[in-house]
């Protein structure tokens, strides 16, 4: 609706016919992504889901659930640990090494090689790590857990983008610490 109200235009000003907006809407309802430069990539930005940008995350979560149902759940704890270590290394290299070129792990929203690969790693590492934690979890008593969690979230959300200094991607290091340890 917002795309139609906004004039049905791509970023470069190209007018999009109503029938393409309707087709794109229907494809989005069925979680069928748009490939870059395809007819249903109506906003001209290369997004997987042009009418609902954040839906890329749900798309990768569905892929994760399919992989879980077919393969990951069958791994014993030792093999899952090996998978998590491999994914941690891949995730760290991608994030700290700034393979996306964005200076952030903000990838996965399009089908280009960097974004799709990055989106898969971005989903698979925390997903597999969460499974490993759930298998090995031993509850401990913490005083004031809500207060401590709230303070921690406020502190980490107040950290701005950390610019690179002499080819060291400080923002990537910060994001890797947040994803791996804090979250």
Which ranges hold each PLM region?
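Aromatic-enriched alpha-helical transmembrane segments of multi-pass intramembrane proteins
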Residues: 1, 20-181
